[in-house]
Structures are given as structure tokens and as C-alpha cells.
UniProtKB/Swiss-Prot annotation:
Name of a matching Pfam family: PSII_Ycf12
Subunit annotation: PSII is composed of 1 copy each of membrane proteins PsbA, PsbB, PsbC, PsbD, PsbE, PsbF, PsbH, PsbI, PsbJ, PsbK, PsbL, PsbM, PsbT, PsbX, PsbY, PsbZ, Psb30/Ycf12, peripheral proteins of the oxygen-evolving complex and a large number of cofactors. It forms dimeric complexes.
Keyword terms, alphabetized: Chloroplast, Membrane, Photosynthesis, Photosystem II, Plastid, Thylakoid, Transmembrane, Transmembrane helix
Gene expressing this chain: psb30
Sequence intervals crossing the membrane: 5-25
Record-level GO BP terms: photosynthesis
Protein name, entry field: Photosystem II reaction center protein Psb30
Length: 34
């Protein structure tokens, strides 16, 4: 397997997973803050 392709796939998965994760963290932080 090519390392560059594996790196791009890992980066893509990280970006896709980081989107909803950040929203959940912000929502939980705002809820706990209130």
C-alpha cells in the first residue's frame, strides 16, 4: 500500500470525524456551562 494514499485517507477520515466531534464538544460544553 502506498504511504501517501494511506496518509490522505487518514487525513480525510480525521476531518470527517472531527466535524461532528467538535460540534458535540461545543454543545456539551455550552450545556454544562449553563
Amino acid at each position: 500500500m502506498n504511504f501517501e494514499v494511506l496518509f490522505q485517507l487518514t487525513a480525510l477520515i480525521f476531518v470527517v470525524a472531527a466535524g461532528p466531534l467538535v460540534i458535540v464538544l461545543l454543545a456539551s460544553r455550552s450545556n454544562s456551562g449553563l
